[in-house]
Regions:
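Surface-exposed interaction regions that form or flank ligand-binding interfaces
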Residues: 1-112, 156-159, 163-252
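Phosphate-centric recognition/catalysis
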Residues: 116
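Active-site beta-strand-loop-beta-strand hairpin of nuclease catalytic cores
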Residues: 119-145
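Long, charge-dense
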Residues: 138-162
Length: 252
């Protein structure tokens, strides 16, 4: 029996470390409880960085369980979110005092409306529209309504992403006004793998493309301000309008 235990220990220590450990697991696994995080060391990390990587990957899965669960109810998580590199990057990089709404569906005048990304920092609300298609794509602003996407020698007309971004801003402004929330709103058009060609500047909008993304993320993650009461109130006001699809746990 002692020999079997030693063999098992050796097998565990031989497990290779891959940076995509959590990327291959597309589903949120069931546990006895989803409200308690218990890291599981399944191999022996060789460096401190490997240990950190193992911890944050497992914690990412716990975050997805936690955000989709309550004591009485649970929601299914679309596997695409487990593979979403931007979501993973935001949850693992941004400070804990940021509150993130990732493509939430809100009930506005009894109609469901899907928004893009909303980040509530202690000092402002970021409305982010994601513009990611082919690698190295160039998005050119031609008019208020239409843009052009260029990939190599190919061109394609598309609807201006600013329409969706401005729409999201108006909805959040309305929610804040109805709840007496005083929090500045800043709009961001984001592409991590392409480029944005916008002539001049536009008030209240930041254009973050492949060239500026690392600097932008670095700026966000160095926030030192503690959570603010108005920030929490703003998050609660948005949560009150969010559409939830869930089912009751068997124990209830």
């Amino acid at each position: 029996k002692l020999s079997e235990e030693n063999d098992e220990q050796e097998d565990i220590e031989k497990v290779t470390i891959t940076s995509d450990w959590a990327m291959d697991n597309d589903e949120v696994q069931e546990e006895e409880t989803t409200l308690l995080f218990e890291p599981n060391i399944v191999y022996t990390p060789q460096t401190l960085e490997e240990l950190k990587k193992m911890f944050i990957d497992q914690f990412f899965h716990f975050q997805m369980k936690w955000v989709s669960s309550t004591l009485r109810e649970k929601s299914y998580v679309d596997p695409k979110f487990m593979r979403d590199t931007l979501l993973r990057s935001m949850l693992q990089t941004l400070p804990d005092n940021y509150l993130i709404f990732y493509f939430p569906i809100l009930r506005v005048k009894k109609a469901p409306i899907e928004l893009d990304i909303i980040i509530l920092t202690p000092t402002e609300c970021l409305c982010i529209t994601l513009l990611e298609q082919e690698d190295q794509a160039v998005f050119i602003a031609n008019s208020e309504r239409f843009w052009t996407k260029k990939v190599g020698k190919n061109e394609k007309k598309l609807l201006s992403p600013l329409i969706q971004l401005n729409r999201m801003e108006k909805i959040i402004e309305q929610i804040f006004a109805q709840n007496n929330i005083e929090l500045p709103i800043r709009k961001v058009l984001l592409t991590r793998n392409g480029y944005i060609d916008y002539p001049g500047t536009m008030y209240g909008i930041s254009f973050v493309d492949k060239r500026k993304f690392p600097e932008w993320m670095n700026y966000l993650k160095h926030s030192v301000s503690p959570m603010k009461h108005m920030q929490i109130r703003g998050a609660q006001a948005i949560l009150n309008t969010v559409q939830t699809t869930s089912f009751h746990r068997d124990i209830w």
